[in-house]
Regions:
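A surface-exposed partner-binding patch
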Residues: 1-102, 164-180
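Intrinsic-disorder-associated interaction segments
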Residues: 1-5, 120-124, 150, 154-161
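Short alpha-helical interface elements
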Residues: 57-58, 64, 68-73, 111, ...
Length: 180
């Protein structure tokens, strides 16, 4: 276990803020995009290349920086995980994009990891919706460049997504009532 990994897992257990390495400063995001064959000019590519990034291996969360970020450790030269973690969130939580269909999420769906429960919870939004949220309060467009490197707190995201989902639920109810 590297010192960074130990610090990261200790912080996870203590429910405190996570340490992350700046993907833009060390080129880690570009390495991750290349390892997962994500086009750098796609919406996901823009976010990965300009956001903080963490990987998951063997059921444990690991923190890497620079060229180590998605270092390969298998004979068949595959990345550590089918999950790609995004975001440095100050009150101790991470978001991830599922890269395959799993029991808890479909491919491309965003999940939320709560350090309190250490469980992944599907958020009911896909990658595009997550990126729209990440960029909508800023001047950049979806095809623009991530300038600030900031990401809002999970509370702010949860509030935003809850409001959006409530609105969609109300619209669905109105449509159902109108059809009846």
């Amino acid at each position: 276990m590297t010192p960074n990994t130990k610090i990261f897992t200790d912080l996870l257990r203590e429910n405190r803020a996570f340490l992350t390495v700046s993907a833009t400063e060390y080129g880690a995001g570009r390495n991750a995009a290349e390892a997962f064959r994500i086009l750098p000019d796609s919406m996901l590519g823009v976010l990965v290349c300009h956001c903080e990034t963490v990987s998951c291996a063997g059921g444990l969360l690991h923190l890497y920086g620079g060229g180590q970020l998605f270092a390969r450790n298998t004979k068949d030269n595959k990345p550590f995980s089918e999950l790609l973690f995004l975001g440095d969130l100050a009150d101790g939580s991470l978001f991830t994009v599922s890269r395959i269909d799993t029991a808890i999420a479909k491919r491309g769906e965003v999940l939320f990891l709560s350090p309190g429960t250490l469980n992944f919870e599907p958020m009911g939004i896909d990658t595009a919706e997550f990126i729209r949220w990440a960029l909508e309060s800023r001047e950049e467009t979806l095809k623009g460049v991530w300038l600030t490197g900031e990401i809002l707190s999970p509370r702010a995201l949860k509030k935003h997504i809850t409001a959006k989902l409530d609105l969609l639920d109300r619209l669905d109810m109105l449509k159902t009532e109108g059809d009846a």
